[in-house]
Regions:
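N-terminal helical cap/lid subdomain that shapes the substrate entry/recognition surface
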Residues: 2-106, 120
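Asp-based, Mg2+/Mn2+-dependent phosphohydrolase catalytic module
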Residues: 1-7, 15-18, 33, 39-40, ...
C-alpha cells in the first residue's frame, strides 16, 4: 500500500525559465566572454550540462556547480578559482530567483491536491538531481512559492553528493521515509526520466511511475492516489 509520494522536480513539477537562461548568457558574455558569440556560449553551457548529467548518473556522484562553471571556462582555455566560481554562482543566483522556474501546473491546483493527499495520511517529498542550480537555491524557490509546507523533506543530489539513479540516492530516500515510519515498499517515486527515476527506483525495489511533461498527467495521478 502506497503511503509516501516522492516527486522529481525538473520537468515533473517545474521547467526552467527561458528568461533566466538568456540573462545568464548575457551576464557571462558581458563579464567574461566578450569575444565569444552568444550562440557558442549557449552551446558550451548545454554541453557542460549534458556531460555533467552523464557523469553524475553513471558514477552516482553530483558534480558541484562551481566545478561546472570551471569546466565551462576551460572550454575557452580560461581558468577560474573555486572562489571565483562561487562568486559567479552567487551573482547568477540573484537572476535565477528573480526569474524562477515555471510550474507546469497551476500552483493553487497543485497545492490543493498535495494538501488533500496529506490530509488523507500520505507523506511527500522532493527527490531531485541538481546541476548548475544548487539545492539550497531550489529551497528558496519552494519558499517563495509557498510550497515548503507541502513536503516532509527535500532531497537534492548536491547535498548528499549522489545523483539518481544511484542506489545511494534512493537509500537516502528510504532513510528519510523510515524517520516517518514509512517502509520502502510503501514509497512511490514519480518522475520524467526513465533512466534516473524509473530504473533507479526499481533497481532499489521502490515503486515508480513515469510521467511525460507534455501529457501533464501528474494532477490526474495524484487524484487517483487520493481516491
Amino acid at each position: 500500500m502506497i503511503k509516501h509520494i516522492s516527486l522529481d522536480f525538473w520537468n515533473t513539477l517545474m521547467v526552467s525559465n527561458k528568461i533566466f537562461s538568456k540573462l545568464r548568457l548575457d551576464f557571462l558574455k558581458k563579464e567574461f566572454f566578450q569575444n565569444i558569440s552568444i550562440e557558442e556560449l549557449s552551446i558550451q553551457i548545454e554541453t557542460i550540462g549534458d556531460e555533467s548529467d552523464t557523469i553524475n548518473m553513471k558514477e552516482g556522484i553530483s558534480i558541484p556547480s562551481e566545478v561546472m562553471y570551471q569546466r565551462l571556462f576551460s572550454k575557452f582555455d580560461l581558468e577560474i578559482t573555486t572562489t571565483q566560481a562561487e562568486k559567479i554562482y552567487n551573482d547568477l543566483e540573484v537572476l535565477f530567483l528573480d526569474n524562477p522556474p515555471i510550474s507546469i501546473y497551476d500552483l493553487d491546483e497543485l497545492k490543493r491536491y498535495l494538501k488533500a493527499l496529506r490530509n488523507n495520511g500520505y507523506t511527500t517529498n522532493i527527490s531531485s538531481n541538481t546541476a548548475f542550480i544548487k539545492g539550497r537555491t531550489l529551497k528558496k524557490i519552494f519558499n517563495d512559492y509557498d510550497l515548503l509546507d507541502y513536503f516532509d523533506f527535500l532531497i537534492f543530489s548536491d547535498e548528499i553528493n549522489s545523483s539518481k539513479p544511484s542506489s545511494k540516492f534512493f537509500k537516502e530516500l528510504e532513510k528519510e521515509c523510515k524517520n516517518l515510519n514509512v517502509s520502502k515498499n510503501s514509497i512511490l517515486h514519480i518522475g520524467d526520466s526513465f533512466e534516473a527515476d524509473i530504473k533507479g527506483a526499481e533497481a532499489f525495489k521502490i515503486k515508480s511511475k513515469l510521467i511525460n511533461i507534455d501529457d501533464k498527467k501528474l494532477i490526474q495521478l495524484l487524484i487517483g492516489l487520493e481516491n
